[in-house]
Amino acid sequence: MSSPDQDPREAIAQGDDEVIDVRRGMFGAAGTGDTSGYGRLVRTVTLPGSSPRPYGSYFDDVVDTLTESLQSNGIEFHQAIEKVVVYRDELTLHVDRAALPHVAQHLRDDPRLRFEMCLGVSGVHYPHETGRELHAVYPLQSITHNRRVRLEVAVPDGDPHIPSLYRIYPTTDWHERETYDFFGIIFDGHPSLTRIEMPDDWHGHPQRKDYPLGGIPVEYKGAQIPPPDERRAYN
């Protein structure tokens, strides 16, 4: 285990990034008539890869303690955790969705860990990460030990189910509803998984990247404003 006072930047050699997409043109859009040169841009879209040991800071202690805690209940670490990522001095555990409640329970209840607070749930949509298009991210806080860890779960677009953490962290109630509302992730076991911001009869999930851009034509001094995906931008 590494020292809590150790600077993680001195201990980490980041693993290879995972390329999930290649984006061409300005904001990935084509056919805009742009003359600024941005249309020739080619960028790879990457996610941080698995980090090697030592992780640095208190991260090794958290991972080692969680490993022992899971094993005491017959759960192997590699079966529950897909990869460990340390990026920008933050620890993220990528969790298998079936193991999410077990991992969260151990992180909360083990006195050596005591991540007693979940700060929310965020959704992310990676449409080109085949089989892992939808991600749910849970930042956890240990008030007892002044530590943070992030849990991340990925599910396919065709089966967007994740076990709800409401029974373990009741504060996720509205956050899971919001993530369902905007991304379409279904949190199994949530007591009332309904929309929270969009109308109940709304079609689709507005923060997904495949959600169509909309626009209302507005007249301004005799001119019509085109929809957002047809406008030029020079800044």
From Swiss-Prot:
GO terms for molecular function: NADH dehydrogenase (ubiquinone) activity; NADH:ubiquinone reductase (non-electrogenic) activity; quinone binding. It is found in: Cell membrane. It catalyses: a quinone + NADH + 5 H(+)(in) = a quinol + NAD(+) + 4 H(+)(out). Keywords: Cell membrane, Membrane, NAD, Quinone, Translocase, Transport. GO terms for cellular component: plasma membrane. InterPro entries: NADH_DH_suC, NADH_quin_OxRdtase_su_C/D-like, NADH_UbQ_OxRdtase_30kDa_su. It is a peripheral membrane protein. Gene3D superfamilies: NADH:ubiquinone oxidoreductase, 30kDa subunit. Pfam families: Complex1_30kDa. Its main location: membrane. Its EC number is 7.1.1.-. NDH-1 shuttles electrons from NADH, via FMN and iron-sulfur (Fe-S) centers, to quinones in the respiratory chain. The immediate electron acceptor for the enzyme in this species is believed to be a menaquinone. Couples the redox reaction to proton translocation (for every two electrons transferred, four hydrogen ions are translocated across the cytoplasmic membrane), and thus conserves the redox energy in a proton gradient. PANTHER family: NADH DEHYDROGENASE [UBIQUINONE] IRON-SULFUR PROTEIN 3, MITOCHONDRIAL, NADH DEHYDROGENASE UBIQUINONE IRON-SULFUR PROTEIN 3. Belongs to the complex I 30 kDa subunit family. NDH-1 is composed of 14 different subunits. Subunits NuoB, C, D, E, F, and G constitute the peripheral sector of the complex. NCBIfam families: NuoC_fam (TIGR01961), PRK07785.1 (NF005856). This is NADH-quinone oxidoreductase subunit C. It comes from Mycobacterium avium (strain 104).
